[in-house]
Amino acid sequence: MEADKDDTQQILKEHSPDEFIKDEQNKGLIDEITKKNIQLKKEIQKLETELQEATKEFQIKEDIPETKMKFLSVETPENDSQLSNISCSFQVSSKVPYEIQKGQALITFEKEEVAQNVVSMSKHHVQIKDVNLEVTAKPVPLNSGVRFQVYVEVSKMKINVTEIPDTLREDQMRDKLELSFSKSRNGGGEVDRVDYDRQSGSAVITFVEIGVADKILKKKEYPLYINQTCHRVTVSPYTEIHLKKYQIFSGTSKRTVLLTGMEGIQMDEEIVEDLINIHFQRAKNGGGEVDVVKCSLGQPHIAYFEE
């Protein structure tokens, strides 16, 4: 069989040597491309894994507290261009968690100098019922937190349109949207631009005049007629959100002190917190006005620090 195979290859070489060489070259090229593809897929997978890990590390989830805003005055704009957008900005600072281990307590003083004095004294003897307990005061090292500014702009000239049916070619749908949103009887007006995304079934409509977007947004839906069929598309404000001045910070709490050495105490935590509070309220013990005390005698607790 091996001899027959060699004879066959020899016959192929004799009858079409150029084609045989070309086939061999193509085969080698295909093998090389296949190897490169496998290598590239491995590199892509590795980079995607690293990207996911980096994304998880810098993901932020914060519940922004409700803030009451006070209306002060009305400004008269110098020209219509100042009415084209509504903008606002606010700063967000994340809370930094700290785990209080069993036998530890955190005490926060009203003044920084009191906390620093308690730390500098290091050893303190606190009377816990019949026990004169020695505790050690240490600074509280905090994990990294983040701080950034959020800028939000709401356009008075543009609107978002979603739930657009995929029934026309892209250029036809763009023309249909422009025609539909320019009809004044439906609250529309002259359209300056249509940015249509067929894949997501959405579009951004930009109007020429201020006020048209506001009229359309009052109804939340808008009629879109295609081939004598009325489709109800959803309209919503067009907003742009920017994150600026993103900062990662870490450090040591200036007013809070970590107390250790209470592992052997078996009492109600609130009673121990009151006794610690009383001890460190006294100036003769190196203390001062106490803001809050939190101790852990059983399960660890999580305390949150704000900037």
From Swiss-Prot:
Record annotation: effect of changing K56R: No change in TRIM21-mediated ubiquitination
Q: What induces it?
A: Up-regulated by interferon IFN-alpha and IFN-gamma. Induced by IL2/interleukin-2. Induced by Sendai virus.
* Residues spanning the membrane: none
Q: What is its main location?
A: cytoplasm
Which domain of life does this protein belong to?
A: Eukaryota
Question: Single Gene Ontology BP term?
Answer: negative regulation of interferon-alpha production
The entry's family comment says:
Belongs to the NMI family.
Which protein are we looking at?
N-myc-interactor
